[in-house]
Amino acid sequence: MSLDGKIGIVTGGTGGLGLEIARELARNGATVVITSRKQSKLQKACNLIGNNCYGFQLDVSKKKSLLNFAGSISKYFNNVDILINNAGFPFERKIWFKKVHNISEIELMNIIRVDLVGSFRITGEILKIMMKRRKGVIISISSTPAISGHNFGSPYSIAKAGLISLTKHIAIEYGQYNIRSFSVALGDIDTQAMRRSLSKKEILKAKNENTMKRLGRPEEIAKSIVSLAGENFSFLTGNTIIIDGGKVII
């Protein structure tokens, strides 16, 4: 698959799965734009990605930051071919393990503001660019709890379910512009963030919750996600692709 000449944006692209997606885009020939709330992380990540990488500071939860970013993209690039909505609210145990009746409105909205509203806003800005070129692919990183529910983490599940709905709306509203959209519902992925957040016992439990009895590897997940941006799936849109090692079927 070749993405030569394509420009791809990965929000939250300086670490974990986001960085691996950005690297996979670059390996396939794309020029990559990564974003992070922290300026200090951008250059280090671009060094890992390669020459065709540009870093922009962006806080998707802040409207002014989003508008400044969109203005910079319009100024420095003629088009955007691929948008990966990957930025997410950091995992917090004290919120994740709360039941619905114990979650405050502030805790709920902090997660929704980043995971859903931020992705919604940046998608709207990038759609304006894609519509002019009459082409583009938008991929939003969702999660299996958005489909199956979970014992914990209801704000996260709600936000990720919203991305699945957004994906369908993009497909219906913008298919006439040759703009395709996907959401990717991920299972448990072996990232540094996961290993920092969960105990060894919790990680073992996560492995046993899918049919393959292991965690997903960031590099294999990135390959699957990036393949959706190519021409092999040119008549596929509005779908949620489940990549979870068979978690939701057991």
Regions found by a protein language model. Give the residues of each.
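A conserved structural motif in NAD(P)-dependent oxidoreductases
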Residues: 210-221
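Catalytic Tyr-X3-Lys loop
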Residues: 81, 101-120, 135, 139, ...
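Active-site helix of classical SDR
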Residues: 123, 159, 167
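Residue(s) in the substrate-gating loop at a strand-loop-helix junction
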Residues: 143
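Alpha-helical segment proximal to the catalytic Tyr-Lys
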Residues: 128, 172-173, 234
